[in-house]
Amino acid sequence: MKINRTQWIDYEQCKLDLVGKNVLIVDEVDDTRTTLHYALHELEKDAKEQAEAKGIDVSKIPEMKTNFGIFVLHDKLKPKKADLPDEILLDENRYFAAKQVPDKWYAYPWESTDIVYHTKMAIKQGNDIFFENEDEI
């Protein structure tokens, strides 16, 4: 099995073929869900176009259908502005959230240029990795 980590896909350059693959979309947070909705929609469209270009009808050859799953670190408990298909969202094998969290702003260390400031803000918000429970702070 080969794992490809990709942010923006240039199909020509990377020779990436989505047809018949299992694709996992990964994001830090399911906030408004608009990013996940957009990413899924675009990848589904790309997979369909690639299958058509190869003359593959996935309704007749179901094993060539591209399967999508989604993993997020944090699923914010709030109304979403966009939807995901029930076949993904309601399937525990296709939608994974490491943790459901309140609707707060979460700062991730890979987005910070100043780790000291980031850590201070994380502690202030009750999101320090050394504490299991916000009440311990």
Stretches with model-predicted labels:
Residues L24-D27, F71-L73:
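Acidic beta-strand-to-loop metal/phosphate-binding motif
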Residues H41-I137:
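PRPP-dependent phosphoribosyltransferase catalytic core
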Residues M1-I25, D31-H41:
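Short, glycine/charge-rich flexible loops or terminal/linker lids adjacent to PRPP-binding catalytic cores
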Residues D30-D31, L77:
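A short acidic, glycine/proline-enriched capping/turn motif at secondary-structure boundaries
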